[in-house]
Amino acid sequence: MFQTSRSQLLYLSALGVWGLWGYAYFNGMFTRLDTITRTLHFPDNRPLRDSYTGLGPLDKQLTLLSVFYDVLTNSLSSGPRLLFFDINYAVACTNLWTLIESRRRGVRSWFLKYPAWAMVLCNANGAAIVLPIYLYCVCRSKARLRDPVVPLHEAVALPIITVVMLLQPLLIFAPAWFGYSGSETHHALIALFQVAPVIVLGLYVGITSLLSYHFPATSLSSKEYKKWISASLILAGSVASAVHIYTLTGALFTRDSDVSLTRLFVPTGGFTDPIKTLVSNENLLAEYAALLENLHLFSQWDWIVVCLTSVVYAQLLLSRREGLKVNKPAVPYEAQEMIYLTIATVVLGPGGAGSFALAIREARI
């Protein structure tokens, strides 16, 4: 019988490295990104903004990320943009998961207590690489065994910060909806999106400081804090599920071949430079279309690994085997949970399925 283990999260991170950056080494993605950041122009001759903070090394990194996010969020494509929209809401949910686990009173490590660094790296390097490693550390921690309680004032702040987290993806997608696709404003919002996790965590700390006067530690109730955590998870899961169902509906009922199920979710190519196999497209220059294919392949592998990671992580926490040196044998109901999680992930997406599963798990602690 298949059994989840926390080591599988490390294997998934390795798969993420290969899917995101391994193929990119062979299929021309790195060369195209380097050319654009060097010339400061996209293949379709649109200018690329290169000044954000006045700090050279930081601006260089933000410029590179602007290329990546611009191509996947502008109005020149439909399918790749729709998948990327879905991914960002799944990642918003995983950010909430990490924040909740960081608030447990049993957490001693600053590495886990302030997860903004992991959220930033998910945006900058790919969630498929960073997220499995961070969740492995969460599962390896004995914080929940020591003291799983979240202080009430911190739990009460979670629904507020959940709303803020769910609004974050709009920073990068809204410009295309309002006619500012690919503009300097769009690039500035992309840069803001990269540091948004730090701002959000700072906002959360500020809100909890204010709430601490109204919810002192002495008023802590086990049942009281859980309902706020569950409400946050259900809110995030509902929004992410709606986004994923919207994506699936669009793929199933559209006549646009760029938004079909296989186009969205099934990786094609890999080692081959897409410019060699592209079908002529009068709407996109060949070099730009090749870059879009490079980045879409990146997104597809990001999606696959995030889905698998959410299933493994949720199953580990539901089965109460996280933090243990030796995993206990799986029992029949755990196999059933795995099947339910997998089906839910397909239908609701990793953000929705994982969030609802963790809301159930919260009641079991």
Swiss-Prot record:
Keywords: Isomerase, Membrane, Transmembrane, Transmembrane helix. It is found in: Membrane. Pathway: Polyketide biosynthesis. Its EC number is 5.4.99.-. It is a multi-pass membrane protein. It comes from the Eukaryota. This is Terpene cyclase DEP1. It comes from Fusarium langsethiae.
